[in-house]
Amino acid sequence: MEALEVDDISPALEVTEDFFSTFDSKLEKAVQQAEVYGIQEVPELVGHEVLGNIADNGALRSVASLGKGTMIWDHCKSRLLETKAQNVFPAKEQLMVQRGTAPDNLSWMAQKEASTFNFFNICQRRRDRPRSVNDLLDETTTFKPGHARSRSDVTHVDWRVVLSTMPLQQQQQQQQASLQGIHFPGPSFLLSSPSKVEDAQGNTEHKQTFPNILKKGYLEIRKNHDSYWQSCYAELSPYNLNFYSLDSSGNQNLYATYQLSHFQSISVLGNLEARMVDTVLYDNSQLQLKAESPWEALDWGQKLWEVVHAAVPNYMGRQGEMANSPGLIHHGDCAQNHCLQKKSSGLLASPVLDSPKQYQNILKSGTLYRLTVQNNWKAFTFVLSKAYLMAFHPGKLDEDPLLSYNVDVCLAVQIDNLDGCDSCFQVIFPQDVLRLRAETRQRAQEWMEALKTAANAARSSEQNLQVTLRNKPKDQLDGRELRKNKRQSVTTSFLSILTTLSLERGLTAQSFKCAGCQRSIGLSNGKAKVCNYSGWYYCSSCHVDDSFLIPARIVHNWDTSKYKVSKQAKEFLEYVYEEPLIDIQQENPMLYLHAEPLATVVRLRQRLKSLRAYLFSCRAAVAEDLRRRIFPREYLLQQIHLYSLADLQQVIEGKLAPFLGKVIKFATAHVYSCSLCSQKGFICEICNNGEILYPFEDISTSRCESCGAVFHSECKEKSVPCPRCVRRELQKKQKSFWRQLNVDESLEEACAMFELSYQST
């Protein structure tokens, strides 16, 4: 393309000069400009006048909407709002320095630069405005060096939606009853928008890079103040918050996923130097996030609150109710503590509410620490309903409760001062005394009040029910249901101490009453008999000296003797006699070293597990034959450390090992004779002698625990690293690793550099 001559564009320059001259003359009439050493000062009226017009016309929802990529809170103090408004335009001193470098004898274009700069600054504010909260604060004079701009923002805002929202003044009038803190507007990125959206520059070919990821970046997380910080990679989607762990090679593996509907509160703690986002889930468990910089943490808190806000449809209608809620945390200074609370009743249905009838009417739920018989505190998730107090494993509310107590039989709720801790309290039931500890004294008081209220309400409702049904026969008072509930409570209590050694607590802990029938025992009321399974005391009617194996004594001491237990304990042990509830590897893995019969059984079960992989991949008739021989104890094939009380008794009597030997003999004969299974062997990669090896030949072979490769036992004993594991590690290396070694990209040549040193066998 040929260059244009000067004469061809001079008319356009003359018209432009006349236009800017008219604009400058209007500014001179409005404000008298001061001349300081030949530098023209920019009038401050232009920026504030334009900003005021925009706010009065309702063109923008908030001052922060001048930023392109992120929205700021619109319900904060006027002092913070004014600071943001002043920093929307560049500082006056910076413009003076830039224009001061130009001499007075430049061409007419340079002479007009000072007067026209404000015009371009206003007209092009969409190009020059900051892209997020971090960029907005980059231009303030109080900015600290070393701050790194976050590049994890991938949100694209539909500006036609933003510009059409109500102005800031109207929104503040409608939200006078809202929280005194920092409040985020509704997220515009979750709204529906046309397929082609015109941005600030008129570009309609705008495409989202990550449509399902609202924010991502590297964070450090921990679950409470006692745990350690763990580095991970986080991704925020419209419904989940995903965390990925990083291995030594930089690969990302999914570590944990949190549903946004389970978040109860989101807080950005501390002042401007804070780097932590504190969240509370529906079960009162904590999740803390720490970013690389304070403003990055602030941005994470904003994005997280916006998405949680949009994930809960009923939340907008509950803002007035939330402002008067006593459970919210109010802070005096919103610039130092940015706390955002969300009422739990406005959340979507959590797993606690998706349960049977006994899980409904939840009054309170949270994490409490229970004092076990080993004199240590163990965390449980307690759920208090109108009828029951239940304890679950943390994060496993969909499973059956470990403990379950009827609230109507609660005897007392009192403070526990034995340990000198003000957050400990006791909940006394006829069959047990719960010693619990909360995280703070306030939470302990809340739990005590909730328990007392629930117990009084349950007793009063039961009394009213008895008065109403006074003339009815006793068999119509749901006696069967009451006995069923009592039996279920006893069963769950006994199940929680299945592998726990019992300790005698004394008759004082039971208020000198029988744990079975509540009859007075001790002293002159009758002899008290102790149950060796639970450690509770019973009367002569509830304890008739029945003998039974104690699972905890077998697991921890390999004590195979029978001890006297109560009727309730015997009924429970007979009920779970054939249930695989005891995991030796989890409870006491050292037992295999001291109990030779148990070590023999676990070796046979390991062989049977290896044979199962062969037979279950063969014909269906063969797999069915193996399943029939082992029925109904198929867990013997899959989980080699899981036992029932009947299995342990057979181990003691020496009957389980011969039974497993017969099944192994049948499966081994099939593998050797089957044309399909016999071809699924291994070759020792250390000696490479061509002999076919099978993993169930545990005497002559050894198997790698990482990759599952099979070698000769003699070859593996030479402490040679597994060739397959080494090969897999080399395949994970990046190309930069091989370039540093001056090796071609060929994998065979690269792996040949790391030959293993071993003697030929």
Swiss-Prot record:
GO terms for cellular component: cytoplasm; Golgi apparatus; plasma membrane. Keywords: Cell membrane, Cytoplasm, Golgi apparatus, Membrane, Metal-binding, Phosphoprotein, Repeat, Zinc, Zinc-finger. GO terms for molecular function: zinc ion binding. The keyword DNA-binding does not apply. It is found in: Cytoplasm; Golgi apparatus; Cell membrane. Widely expressed. Expressed in C2C12 cells (at protein level). Pfam families: PH, RH_dom. The modification Phosphoserine is found at S132. Its main location: cytoplasm. CDD domains: PH_PLEKHM3_1. Residues 212-309, 361-456 form the PH domain. GO terms for biological process: myoblast differentiation. A zinc finger (Phorbol-ester/DAG-type) spans 669-722. The keyword Metal-binding applies. Interacts with AKT1. Involved in skeletal muscle differentiation. May act as a scaffold protein for AKT1 during muscle differentiation. PANTHER family: PLECKSTRIN HOMOLOGY DOMAIN CONTAINING PROTEIN (PTHR12326), PLECKSTRIN HOMOLOGY DOMAIN-CONTAINING FAMILY M MEMBER 3 (PTHR12326:SF10). This is Pleckstrin homology domain-containing family M member 3. The lineage of its organism: Eukaryota, Metazoa, Chordata, Craniata, Vertebrata.
